[in-house]
């Protein structure tokens, strides 16, 4: 009995080992299904589930309370009461419908949840059944099937070993035949791909070419439009009407229609929203505001009438130019004739030297009235054709600017005239200011005449000669004042003897002034009103020099240093720039330089030598140093760059309240009265 049990146990062990899955065989039994009720019971058996339910009830009740607080109870209750009073049946029906809807929705939700749970349970049960069928076949069937499969594999291996070499060769040939076929098919595929690629490339090339053509056309049309816009200066009347409208129409056609739609799409909604919020007129269903029609369509229509108007205007302009040119020529010839006559009269009237003026003064008074009438007529003629002669005026201005640069070289008077002018200036120094003004007018007139003599030497330039002598016509006003000048010169002769000591110190000054005076031509562009201001400054300077050099030699030491620094700044002009700067400025600049330098030199001499020797020593030193200063002024290229303006020159000597206040104003001396000042108005009262 013991042997049988041992054998039986061995057989059982072999079955377990032979089983490849390693799983113990199960007894065939059905899996139990869990129902929804069982799930609910299992969940709610624990206290945690009940806590969750209570928390949910509390939160949703709080939400309901908040919502009811937000509701307006008065209106709600009043409306409900009114409805109940009017038609209670409707109210009841509405309430029933609402409640049924709520209840139906709630039950549908519950049914969905329950049905989903039931479906999941059914699927789990089916899977369990399938697994049981797969796992529970008898062991014997598996073993038999495995044995049969192994027996079938062994004879197949033996048959394969007996295959002859011929079959192997045939197989190899078959493989070789298959390989070239594969290669051929591969080549065909490559060819097809290449063909498709070439077709695509050709299509792309065509597209690119068409794009390039369209771009070139557009560029050409743009260039044509630009050229036609640039041409109207040369040929406006002919070419513009032909080309510009076409170019504009083409450009309008070329501009694609897409941007217009895009603009509508972009801005239509914006307009709609703005109208909604700002105006409040539009309703949500209303169509948005239509954007205004584009102006591109109306452009060619507008361009044609404008071009016709341009043509008409151009024709009128051409006709006006022709008529204006003919009128200019006629008036220019008439003017030349009248100016030649005035030149001949001027040559006869011009006195050569200042002593001859005494004889001509009586004649000048009678001629003054006649020249005034001529001036009025000339001014009327000049006022009538101002618009028709813009070019003639420009030429006159150019020639005026050119001439004063050339004339000063020939305008230096003879040395005999210098001495006479020096004596005349010494005589004028203590004459009343009213007489000095008139005298200076007379002198300027003489200088202007000498300038005219220099200009008459050049007969080759007819136009500038005539134009300058037109401006020399206002001389008779100055000539009338010569009478008063000559009378006052006779009175001033006894005073010359008293001031003989001053003559030596002022000769150097007068010589330098005489060198620059021929350049003191009346500037062409400036009016005659500025002349009296300059005259006041000149007379004030002369009287101050005379008084200071007589009385206050020791006080000059204090003034020497600051004015020398200022004079260094004013050594700016070169002879090249003297032609450009107006001669009034040149006079005053030279005068300021000599004045400041003279004071500095006198102060140096006063330290070394006693007062009576100053005049003799200062003469020689001044003459030698003034020559050096002239050369220094010529060789100073950097100082050219900042010429002093006209108003600076006029107000250098003192601050009148009109211009800037400069440091050149002379300091009051301790010996002088505090009431005295440098303004020419007060000096008139003192004298």
From Swiss-Prot:
Main location: membrane
Region entry Disordered, spans: 117-265, 280-643, 660-687
Organism field: Rattus norvegicus
Name of the protein in question: Triadin
Composition-biased stretches (Polar residues): 295-306, 631-643, 667-687
Ranges per topology, Cytoplasmic: 1-47
Listed Basic and acidic residues bias regions: 131-265, 307-356, 371-390, 396-431, 442-459, 466-501, 539-583, 594-630
InterPro entries, alphabetized: Asp-B-hydro/Triadin_dom, Triadin
